[in-house]
Regions:
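FIC/Doc superfamily catalytic core
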Residues: 1-13, 18-29, 44-230, 234-292
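Beta-hairpin "wing" of winged helix-turn-helix
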Residues: 33-35
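Minor-groove-contacting beta-hairpin "wing" of winged helix-turn-helix DNA-binding domains
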Residues: 37-44
């Protein structure tokens, strides 16, 4: 008589993905499951666990606000603690944000480059992008400390650090038309960039809605303008984190493995809101767990 089942068998039995079964095992939501190496063994008669995930954008945004309030109660972290959290976050964030744009460094290689090492047979450009992104992240941390408002000048400064490998294009709006492969719409013409960026900053400054909603719209708007010749994606994601941290939230790290979902979200504001909200919700959980 069979007394146990694999995650694949549980997935088929319960009608959920195998990945979801593994997550439930890892989070202790499946009673009696045992991990053996990389495998999970689940008792045959175990009932399907309740799906505790938050459904719907509004309820997830409400949950984020609740967790933010809880985080505020447990603070403040010391400057050293914040610095350590940012350092740990920055390495993987730099890897993911650069990888989304085609950088070939692995996570381990990115870590090594940020420690001053050189990776054999990897382009100098990839090394410089890693270092530039690191500097840009620490720059936005400085901006958060000093409560600098978001403006075009700040965005250009962020971009000038991101584009470490292109000194003549750093912090300068493009002067030629560009096309984004796979995009449904072309970025605005160069002569419209100044006006469009001015409108984007004005609308964002006047927006009083939930931080996740307005940042999703800001990000889509910024990337649709595509103001720089290169480095728009990395700069745009740094802007999102700058504003999250200024509002007292932890920064988010959109994973390279999630890039297709991220790309698809540019065509649907609701998808981008949901993507940002899910990442922010998980980051808040991490911070709350650290603080006990």
């Amino acid at each position: 008589m069979k007394i146990a089942m694999t995650t694949k068998e549980a997935s088929e039995k319960w009608g959920i993905s195998q990945r979801r079964v593994r997550v439930l095992c890892r989070d202790g939501k499946i009673e009696g499951c045992i991990q053996k190496g990389k495998l999970w063994i689940i008792p045959e008669n175990t009932k399907k666990p309740a799906d505790g995930r938050i459904k719907g954008k509004e309820s997830l945004l409400e949950l984020i606000e609740q967790k933010k309030k809880e985080l505020d109660i447990r603070r403040p972290l010391t400057e050293g603690e914040v610095s350590k959290l940012h350092e740990d976050f920055m390495i993987e964030y730099t890897y993911n944000s650069n990888a989304i744009e085609g950088n070939t460094l692995t996570l381990r290689e990115t870590d090594m480059v940020l420690k001053g090492l050189t990776i054999d047979r990897k382009p100098l450009k990839d090394h410089m992008e890693a270092v530039g992104h690191k500097e840009a992240f620490y720059f936005i941390c400085h901006l958060v400390k000093n409560s600098y408002p978001l403006c075009e000048s700040v965005i250009k400064q962020i971009h000038s650090l991101v584009l470490a490998d292109r000194p003549f294009d750093r912090g300068i709006y493009r002067r030629i038309p560009v096309r984004i492969h796979g995009a449904k719409h072309n970025p605005v013409q160069p002569y419209l960039i100044e006006a469009k960026m001015n409108d984007l900053m004005k609308n964002y400054a006047e927006d009083r809605r939930n931080i996740v909603i307005k940042l999703a719209e800001l990000h889509i708007g910024f990337e649709s303008i595509h103001p720089f010749i290169d480095g728009n994606g990395r700069t745009g994601r740094l802007i999102v984190n700058l504003e999250l941290m200024k509002a007292g939230y932890p920064p988010i790290d959109i994973k390279f493995t999630d890039r297709m979902r991220y790309y698809d979200s540019f065509a649907d504001k609701e998808k981008m809101i949901k993507l940002f909200a899910e990442y922010l919700n998980r980051r808040l959980d991490q911070y709350l767990q650290i603080l006990g």
